[in-house]
Amino acid sequence: LWNKPLEIGLCNKAKYTYNARTETVDKKPSFRHAWAKSQFALIPVEKIYEPRYVNGKAERWGIYREDGLPFTVAAIYDSTVIDGQQVRSMSMLTINADNHPFMSQFHKPEDEKRSIIVIPEEYREDWLNCKKEEADQFFFEMPVAEFKSNYFPKPNKKPPA
């Protein structure tokens, strides 16, 4: 959920923007204010999910560290007031992954390949405190040797009783 004017998006209140492209984050109306203020964040995760196309059909694949430890994803954040309540939002920053040996297997074959940015533990504080002019120093490619992926079908939802 990203904080934009109340007339945009879901229920005329907000807009879902899970990802922000590093190439355009400073220009997009949804993100440029937060970028200008260097409002950087980290999202801790154990696994992310991406579509992988097998025989023309999307399958849900989980991407996680080989050692099973959580990792942190570079993000940008902002806040706004909706119906009198403060709403905070974050979007993961992504980089091009067309030529990445691991991340290029995800998304539709004809689409541009994108990757999250994993911020290693030793750079977390630096990322959170950097200025927008320094941010590209942290646009690391996914470390291939540390990650793996497997098919993770969505759990079946139980029908209402």
Segments (PLM) and residue ranges:
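C-terminal accessory segment of soluble enzyme catalytic cores
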Residues: 93-161
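A motif-centric signal for short, conserved binding hotspots located
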Residues: 5, 64-96
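Residues that flank catalytic or metal-binding motifs in active/ligand-binding sites
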Residues: 39, 59, 69, 88, ...
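Short acidic/glycine-rich loop or secondary-structure boundary segments that cap or lie
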Residues: 50-54, 82-84, 101-102, 158
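Extended alpha-helical targeting/anchoring segments
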Residues: 28-38, 50-76
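Tight coil/turn sites that cap or link beta-strands
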Residues: 46-47
